[in-house]
């Protein structure tokens, strides 16, 4: 077992604070509309330029193991906030640094760490309640764009694109962010249910210019097994030909004789047909096929359910207004499923999202929910260089997460104002003893830290700006750091999602109050490495 290095009391806390300050000072320069960029050296490829707090935090590893403990614990604050709210990581870091710094001063002055922690927890709960009371729901498309613009560092174009995407796919829709191949940032909205399987054979193409199979008012056969022989399908195919409508076959695979026969019939013009492989694998494939069946009003043809291909009728097939298939994707537009059945399926998927503990499963369930209830939008981020594209993509991700949070929980005035004004609530709180009162004072001071930092990053005196904001009694009155003016922030479109502000404070207080109660640090001792043999030494060969 490796030997350990141990630090106690004041020495331990000083090293911890040094690591926290190093990471926080690197992260907090990015806060606000006039925050600066951080350039990160990568072991491979070009350096990364970013204004995203959590990206900076994740890259910092300190050589001193005791200081690195502090940096790692503060990094946890940023990561947790990012996981829960998707934005607000720099605000959380600034709050945590202030709480830890003031808290360690209180402990050094002889106050009881556990009571100080209780005071911090009590004050944090009161502030979160105040934020919820002051929240108002996001009401207009313009407000959605404003939230996104603020989070994207004031880039109006990003705000407009995200607002448009949210408008088109709804709150249950999925919005993904990708890197574009050109200079422009653009929005691509997928109409209908799309899955990532294209036509099995290019002979199914109906439009040779666009290389797509375009089926109008088709029937849809949804089969979970492979189709190797057409014999069981013949009665159904005859009925489809009589109806004069096209047919899409979705199956695990179509191969051999079955594929050859379908292609020959398609080329002769007797049967308008296309075939695609079923999306997904295993249980997920079964679930997606069931989704498609419910959306199109059909049934999944499965021997497990006692349904055989020979006995399938037209009434068991799905139907849609249109289906478009290219070499990579299939899109079903306006499925003719029963609205109540679709609503029931959506409720079922929502319940599964609530229950699952796996991030991967949650992401896949949300994709399925979007395809049934909302839609899918893709934001393609462009730029002149790869470095610029990556930096913009970071900001688009933050803006998108902030917008989702605003739709979910509402908004409060931005620019650090909502937190600074919540300090009044802490001042009115009752505490059991003086040590807990000190914990409340620590939170009260920390609540001004984001507003001060935003002002300082804009070249102003943070204390003076905070004083002017709090002198004015109007709740929405604050500092617009972009142009250096005091105004009604909500009217000016400077707003923050309540969820982001709340999560930042909760995570900062949680980790910050635990750090205050730290008395001992234990790390592994660095083992001295054996010296390399001198060049040209006799190695005994």
From Swiss-Prot:
Domain of life (superkingdom): Bacteria
Entry EC no(s): 5.6.1.7
Gene3D superfamilies, A to Z: GroEL (3.50.7.10), GroEL-like equatorial domain (1.10.560.10), TCP-1-like chaperonin intermediate domain (3.30.260.10)
Statement: the UniProt record of this protein carries the keyword Manganese: no
Annotated Gene Ontology cellular component terms: cytoplasm
Keywords on record: ATP-binding, Chaperone, Cytoplasm, Isomerase, Nucleotide-binding
Plastid is among the record's keywords: no
Pfam families on file: Cpn60_TCP1
Enzyme class: isomerase
NCBIfam families (alphabetical): GroEL, PRK00013.1, PRK12849.1, PRK12850.1, PRK12851.1
Protein name according to UniProt: Chaperonin GroEL 2
Native organism: Gluconacetobacter diazotrophicus (strain ATCC 49037 / DSM 5601 / CCUG 37298 / CIP 103539 / LMG 7603 / PAl5)
Upper classification of the organism: Bacteria, Pseudomonadati, Pseudomonadota, Alphaproteobacteria, Acetobacterales
Underlying gene: groEL2
